Swiss-Prot record:
Keyword Transcription regulation in annotation: yes
Subcellular location, record wording: Cytoplasm
GO molecular function: copper ion binding; DNA binding; DNA-binding transcription factor activity
One cellular component term from this protein's GO annotations in UniProt: cytoplasm
GO biological process: positive regulation of DNA-templated transcription
Protein name per its UniProtKB record: Uncharacterized HTH-type transcriptional regulator PA4778
Taxonomic placement: Bacteria, Pseudomonadati, Pseudomonadota, Gammaproteobacteria, Pseudomonadales
Major site of localization recorded for this protein: cytoplasm
Family annotation (SUPFAM superfamilies): Putative DNA-binding domain
Alphabetical keyword list: Cytoplasm, DNA-binding, Transcription, Transcription regulation
Short name of any one Pfam family annotated for the protein: MerR
UniProt KW Isomerase keyword: no
Length: 132
């Protein structure tokens, strides 16, 4: 199948497929006599794997490691688990950061009168981060 068909079936854009190929997450596509890329079912499985990994928030480097493990039939599942567990720890750290940001902003929203007066604690807080 050509790149357009592979894109449609994988849910990725042709640009992303070419990018994944350029950074070697996807093997170089075969070429037709006219030079068009040609993808097979194995490529579609790899693209689905990449897409799902990215949907779960894995970095491109992590996706590469996961692909290597996926393709290695002699892999130890402990290696996969360790990589996934590290990712969970990173997600938890990011969630904590976002929760703190949300709480701070919620507090500012609650203290803003939201009326016709120009006084606004949200803007004061934003301006206070500059030039100490």
């Amino acid at each position: 199948m050509n790149i357009g068909e592979a894109a449609k079936k994988s849910g990725l854009t042709p640009k992303m497929i070419r990018y994944y190929e350029s950074i070697e997450l996807l093997r170089p596509a075969g070429r037709s006599a006219s030079g068009y890329r040609h993808y097979n079912e194995n490529d579609l499985h790899t693209l689905a794997f990449i897409r799902r990994s990215r949907d779960l928030g894995f970095s491109l480097d992590e996706v590469g490691k996961l692909l290597t493990l996926w393709q290695d039939r002699q892999r130890a599942s402990a290696d996969v688990k360790a990589l996934a567990a590290q990712h969970v720890r990173e997600l938890n750290r990011k969630i904590e950061e976002l929760s703190t940001l949300r709480d701070t902003l919620q507090d500012l929203v609650e203290h803003c009168q939201g009326d016709h007066r120009p006084d606004c604690p949200i803007l004061k807080d934003l301006a206070s981060g500059c030039c100490h």
